[in-house]
């Protein structure tokens, strides 16, 4: 949900850093926040990190969002340099420039090796639920559920609050029916990075103030200035999902026992241990969180490969 907060942007930053290292290949970025601005912002990020050809899929469902920070993607996408040229070039000018997320999912998944794709969902669940319900098309004779079963290795989701069964977490609350559908029907293993994990592992403001002397302009820092007007400590919610998807636990996380996570009609998430369950969630203790934050600080402040 690019634009509702800046941890989405840092999560994409981390994916590009992993791609720089050859540890990940980014097939596409799917938006589940409406509007052309978020699509433009994702494309300008991909371009800034040296991968302008990464496909961007537009949202297929309007989420139920209330409140939130200013929509910084639109502002950053419109920024100009001293000569009046786009500060962060991008080619998207209208929503129709982007395929819808389900069509893009089906096109890309059909071309991948079986059980080779990891999907990292750090926003709402509308695209994933719609993918499950999609039918055979020109890209694949398989239904959406069959296509996911064949091509997807696993799903990592930033959603919910495991330690507080009464908490209504934003990503869940913004599209409860779709989130219920994903947790009840998704055919692969799901690993959840819950709200409390990122809330208790915060990227320090000092990182933003002190670690980016290598660049005059940075699209994520500019987004933060628009969204907050200042640098401050901030939770690493979405970033934890990307880190786990690429590195696994790696000393930063502990994986729960298998179980089943259900989403209530009110938007709460409940976990029940079950040896046959396909859901797990991430935890971290004090020492793990310290290492986690140090690692993320090094990653996000590192100069991208194409800027060296």
Label each residue range with its predicted role.
Residues 2-308:
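N-terminal acidic, glycine/proline-rich low-complexity segments
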